[in-house]
Amino acid sequence: LDVLGGGICSGEMPVGSVFTLGDLSERFGISRTVAREVMRALEQLGLVASSRRVGLTVQPMAQWSVLDQAVIRWRLNSQQTREDQLRSLALLRTAIEPVAAREAARHATEAQRAELLEMADRLGTIGAAGRADTDDFLEVDVAFHSLILEASGNEMIVALTESVVSVMRGRTEFGLQPARLSDKSVHH
C-alpha cells in the first residue's frame, strides 16, 4: 500500500496510469485477496478508480483525500511533492490557526489557559536557547498548537489537528525549522 500510494502521490505513477489486480499480485508477490484490499484502500483515498474491463486508473489530485494522514505522509516522503505539500499545509495552518486562537480565547477553560501559558514559556525558553529545531521543541510546539485547536471548542477545527501537526513535524523532520526563533515567533 505504501509503495503504491507513495508512487501515485509522488507522480511516479501519473494520472491516467492503469494497472490491474493481476499486475499488483505479480509485482509484489501477493495474493489477489491482498491486492484487492490494497485496491480498496487506494480507492477509499480517491487515488484510483476501478472499472471492470479496464482495471485501476490513477486519479487526479482533485479526487484524493488530501487531508488523510497517509496521503500527507506519502506526499511529504517524496522529494518531488514535499515542497508543495508543506506549502499547502502551511497555508491551511495560517488560515485556520488565527480563527482557532480567537475561539480558544473565548472558550478555553482555566486549566487550558494555564497549560497554554506554561507551554508558551517552555517554547520561548527552548527557542531562545537555539534549540527550536529539536524534538523537545517539536513535542511542546505540537502540544501547544493542538491545545489551541482543541480549546477553540469547534469540532471542525479540532478535526484539522493532524493536518496542522503534519506541517510542524515535516518542518523539523526535513530540516526546515530554524534552530533559533525570531522575537516575533517567541511571542506568538
Predicted feature locations:
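Short, hydrophobic secondary-structure boundary micro-motifs
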Residues: G16-S17, S51, V158-T161, Q177
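Short, intrinsically disordered, charge-balanced linker/junction segments flanking boundaries
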Residues: L176-H188
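Conserved amphipathic alpha-helical segments that form helical-bundle/coiled-coil interaction surfaces
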Residues: L89-F174
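Short linear motifs at protein or domain termini
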Residues: L1-A95, R102, R106
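A short, mixed-charge helix-start or loop-turn motif at secondary-structure junctions
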Residues: L21, S78-E83, I126-G130, F174-P178
